[in-house]
Design a protein with these regions (language model features):
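Residue-level detector of the transmembrane beta-barrel scaffold of outer-membrane proteins
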Residues: 14-16, 40, 50-52, 70, ...
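Outer-membrane beta-barrel pore domains and translocons
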Residues: 18-22, 54-58, 74, 86-94, ...
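Solvent-exposed loop/turn segments connecting transmembrane beta-strands
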Residues: 23-35, 52-68, 92-103, 153-156, ...
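Short, charge-rich binding segments
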Residues: 42, 60-63, 72-82
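Outer-membrane beta-barrel transmembrane domain signature
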Residues: 96-215
Length: 215
């Protein structure tokens, strides 16, 4: 999912948990999002710049160490809205074979805070609710000439389109995102059956995230 669509405040820390992935037809179960998980941390370096890193815990269970590290930069903002860029580096290492790969990624998202509720502080505590929607594009780049199976790599640029919603209540933020993954590539003749809004092109994805702002 998109990381820190709305950057943290300067000096703020946050912990994040993510669940979800491409939607697949699983025999005997049905159509469900793949239960991929990550845990992560974010830090507001500046008012418009947040640094983050995430550990992919599901991959770890299968002997692959995978992390993504990057930044969320708000390049444009107006009252209740903004545009953020998320340059990210994804790295994976197979603990059994020693094979490793990396994939650069660049996301761009527009967000809009369509509802906001604040109450005056009482006994030192105030109450805040913010509702936001966002939409954007994710660009995944595969710089390798050959795939891990030895075949020629024909998918150097892998775009995806996402829409999402953020619910913030004080320090807690809940995020839901729906994604159209790789809509320009065929989803035929592969091991997993991926339903898609574009027939035999791409796949759909669903993600849920929770993060807590420590300060």
């Amino acid at each position: 999912p998109a990381r820190y669509v709305k950057p943290l405040d300067k000096g703020q820390h946050a912990l994040q948990v993510n669940l979800g992935g491409p939607i697949a037809k699983v025999p005997g179960i049905g159509v469900i999002p793949m239960p991929l998980t990550t845990v992560g941390y974010g830090y507001g370096l500046k008012e418009h710049l947040t640094l983050f890193g995430n550990l992919h815990t599901t991959s770890l269970l299968f002997g692959v160490g995978q992390v993504d590290v990057g930044a969320a930069y708000r390049c444009w903002s107006r009252k209740n809205m903004g545009i953020t860029l998320q340059p990210t580096l994804n790295v994976a290492v197979d603990f059994y074979t020693g094979a490793n790969r990396f994939w650069p990624q660049l996301d761009a998202n527009y967000y809009w805070d369509y509802a906001e509720l604040r109450t005056k502080a009482k006994n030192g505590k105030g109450f805040q609710k913010i509702r936001s929607v966002y939409a954007g594009i994710s660009n995944w780049f595969d710089p390798y000439l050959t795939e891990s199976q030895g075949r020629t790599n024909e998918q150097v640029w892998i775009p995806s389109i996402q829409i999402g919603h953020l619910w913030q209540k004080n320090n807690w933020v809940y995020q839901f995102e729906a994604k159209c993954l790789a809509p320009i590539y065929s989803n035929e003749d592969i091991v997993v059956n991926y339903p898609s809004a574009f027939g035999n092109q791409g796949a759909l994805g669903a993600y849920f995230s929770i993060y807590y702002k420590l300060k």
